[in-house]
Amino acid sequence: MSHPLIFPDFDPVAFHIGPLAVRWYALAYMVSFIIALPIARRLNRLAPEVATNEQVDDFLFYAILGVLLGGRLGYVLFYRPMDYLSHPLEIFKTWDGGMSFHGGALGVILALAYFSWKTRLSFLAFADRIVPVVPIGLGLGRCANFVNGELWGRPASPDLPWAMIFPTGGPIPRHPSELYEALTEGVLLLCVMLFAASRPQVRERFGFLSGLFLFGYACARSFCEFFRQPDANIGFLSGGTTMGQLLCIPMALAGMGLMVYAMRRPAQVSAHV
């Protein structure tokens, strides 16, 4: 019988810049954007022409706003609406944690829609050049969740070699579900998206990559939810499902719909509108 691993004693603060404490989650966001931007620029140079690299750079500001505002509001609305209704000022305490990917995704979609309208770009074509790099942020974000010792998994067999005891998870060994999500939503989905984006026949079907991302994320997240402990204030829903799985259903349906729509339309050689 193997002994479960003990969660490492990580400092919740990655480093300090003078009086400013930079936490791991904020660092994950910053590193994600630094890594993702040059890759998105490289993808944008591939045919068919969609946007200029300057437009990709400009969109970064809108993407950051979409992720932060959408992620926070999504967490408030999807996971703890009554708590924040009673204490509305708590919404602004982002340093205490509480972000939702589904909310962040909606925020980025709205940012994409506004930016595409403002710059007269094709919404689906431009989105296809952005979404392949999103798994970078997902993977690093889940790594930050692990370092923070949060969003841990369900109880695991003590014989599981990587079963771990988390400081806030009680004395029982658990699945390190944050790392499962980092590997599936991050590494695996990134490989799938970059491979698909490298195929000219895929890039010419505007909307296909966006649909593939939505469907791929929904599948990866739904799978990992079987190992992740549900939020304590929500618990399990009907049939043993979780809120994360419930929110993935419309995402998967939208993804499949986009892929079918893209494949039924003729291939495009230009994205100018």
Curated annotation (Swiss-Prot):
Q: In which pathway does it act?
A: Protein modification; lipoprotein biosynthesis (diacylglyceryl transfer)
Q: What does the UniProt entry say about where the protein is found?
A: Cell inner membrane
Its signal peptide is none
Residues bound to a 1,2-diacyl-sn-glycero-3-phospho-(1'-sn-glycerol) are 142
The Enzyme Commission number assigned here is 2.5.1.145
- Single GO cellular component annotation? plasma membrane
What is the predominant subcellular site recorded for this chain?
membrane
> Which Pfam families does this one have?
LGT (PF01790)
Query: Can you tell me where the transmembrane regions are?
Result: 20-40, 59-79, 97-117, 206-226, 243-263
Keyword annotations from UniProtKB, A to Z = Cell inner membrane, Cell membrane, Membrane, Transferase, Transmembrane, Transmembrane helix
Question: What is the protein's membrane topology class?
Answer: Multi-pass membrane protein
**GO terms for molecular function, please?**
phosphatidylglycerol-prolipoprotein diacylglyceryl transferase activity
Which InterPro entries does this chain map to?
Lgt (IPR001640)
GO BP, one annotated term: lipoprotein biosynthetic process
Q: What is this protein called?
A: Phosphatidylglycerol--prolipoprotein diacylglyceryl transferase
Q: Give the organism the record lists.
A: Gluconobacter oxydans (strain 621H) (Gluconobacter suboxydans)
